[in-house]
């Protein structure tokens, strides 16, 4: 019998459409191409409601957080999100402190929409700004300019309890001065959370086909150090690989991922992880919005499903938990995986000998070296079929 303690449960809702597909983006996002956005919104929202209606597992567990991601969720009206939040509230039960986040693109800002999002219960906004530099915005093919980014951020900070600003570094031909200017502009907005992502060239993207010149690994590391030092000086805590927060504004939804919590994925391509008394299982919805829409009415929206093996649980827990700079409590590993900590004794010893992790007061956490070489650290916990450490 699987006896893992049931973790917090979150809901992720995917809105797959955007105005323009950025050249670096490998997410499940699709440009509107001559389609009626309003009609598309209605059809897709009804499909999301249908999937929620057909979600009959663990409906008595409280919902820890809701996250509307994309794509560009801010293309949809407050009325659509109101329907979805109400359906989740009826189907499940919202935690008293439920964090409800919407991702927004500064190029799609509608003031009435922003006010409406707040009115329907959304209390956190994540703005995909990426840069305040006009040259870099054009290179990244963002649909907003610097002023639109500033206006959107100031409006969001005024309206919402918590606001995250997404920024990128190691951009094509980016200088240290340009990066410092981006950081300073972000700090002037006075948001309580900043996410900083290294630009990576992913397969199946425009940048992969036509690679721009980007800073090399050493130059990227220097830029990262500049970011971390500047944000720490400004009272931000670097709590996760790419995330900085102050005043207790860490993202509850993402922390649930990193702590190997459970989540239900609603919408095209959305993934789920669910713990039960028998097992931990993962499943995902069909990725193509068109195919997803055609299958929802048949209650056939699940593409694949699998039960996590012991090796899966070990690697997936560590892959998530070691992203958090404060690491994890030993008893959390045991609660979330239903495995004794001795299951990974050999791997922990190897990681300690390489000075990639340390154990302090019952917590296992990555060292500064481990944070810098996270991929190498995670490889230690990736086993082959014979349970041998790779």
List each model region and its residues.
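C-terminal scaffold of the Radical SAM
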Residues: 6-8, 29-55, 61-339, 389
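Local cysteine-cluster metal-coordination motifs and their immediate loop/turn environment
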Residues: 16-29
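A short, conserved structural fragment
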Residues: 353-362
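Short active-site neighborhood of thiol/selenol oxidoreductases, capturing the structured segment around
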Residues: 11-15
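Short, Lys/Arg-rich nucleic-acid/phosphate-binding segment
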Residues: 244, 361-364
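Basic, amphipathic "hinge/linker" alpha-helix immediately C-terminal to the N-terminal HTH DNA-binding motif
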Residues: 364-371
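Short, amphipathic alpha-helical interaction segments positioned at domain boundaries
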Residues: 371-390
């Amino acid at each position: 019998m699987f006896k893992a303690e049931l973790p917090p449960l979150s809901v992720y809702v995917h809105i797959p459409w955007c105005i323009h597909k950025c050249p670096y983006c490998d997410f499940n996002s699709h440009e509107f191409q001559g389609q009626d956005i309003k009609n598309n919104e209605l059809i897709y929202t009804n499909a999301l409601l249908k999937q929620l209606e057909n979600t009959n597992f663990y409906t008595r567990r409280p919902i820890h957080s809701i996250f509307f991601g994309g794509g560009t969720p801010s293309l949809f009206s407050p009325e659509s999100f109101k329907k979805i939040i109400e359906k989740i509230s009826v189907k499940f039960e919202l935690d008293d402190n439920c964090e409800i986040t919407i991702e927004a693109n500064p190029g799609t800002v509608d003031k009435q929409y922003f006010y409406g999002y707040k009115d329907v219960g959304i209390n956190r906004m994540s703005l995909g700004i990426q840069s305040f530099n006009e040259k870099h915005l054009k290179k990244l093919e963002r649909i907003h300019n610097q002023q639109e980014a500033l206006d959107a951020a100031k409006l969001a900070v005024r309206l919402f309890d918590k606001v995250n600003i997404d920024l990128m570094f190691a951009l094509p031909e980016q200088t240290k001065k340009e990066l410092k200017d981006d950081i300073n502009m972000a700090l002037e907005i006075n948001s309580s959370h900043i996410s900083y992502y290294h630009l990576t060239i992913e397969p199946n993207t425009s940048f992969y086909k036509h690679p721009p010149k980007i800073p090399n690994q050493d130059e990227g590391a220097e830029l990262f150090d500049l970011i971390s030092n500047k944000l720490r000086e400004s009272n931000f805590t670097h709590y996760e690989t790419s995330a900085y927060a102050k005043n207790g504004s860490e993202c509850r939804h993402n922390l649930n991922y990193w702590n190997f919590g459970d989540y239900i994925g609603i919408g095209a391509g959305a993934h789920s992880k669910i713990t039960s008394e028998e097992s931990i299982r993962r499943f995902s919805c069909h990725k193509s919005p068109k195919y997803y829409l055609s299958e929802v009415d048949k209650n056939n929206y699940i593409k694949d499903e699998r039960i996590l093996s012991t090796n899966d649980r070990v690697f997936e827990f560590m892959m998530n938990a070691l992203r958090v700079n404060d690491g994890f409590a030993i008893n959390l590993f045991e609660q979330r995986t239903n495995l004794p900590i001795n299951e990974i004794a050999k791997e922990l010893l190897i990681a300690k000998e390489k000075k990639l992790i340390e154990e302090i007061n019952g917590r296992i956490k990555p060292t500064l070296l481990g944070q810098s070489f996270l991929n190498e650290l995670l490889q230690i916990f990736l086993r082959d079929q014979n349970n041998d450490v790779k």
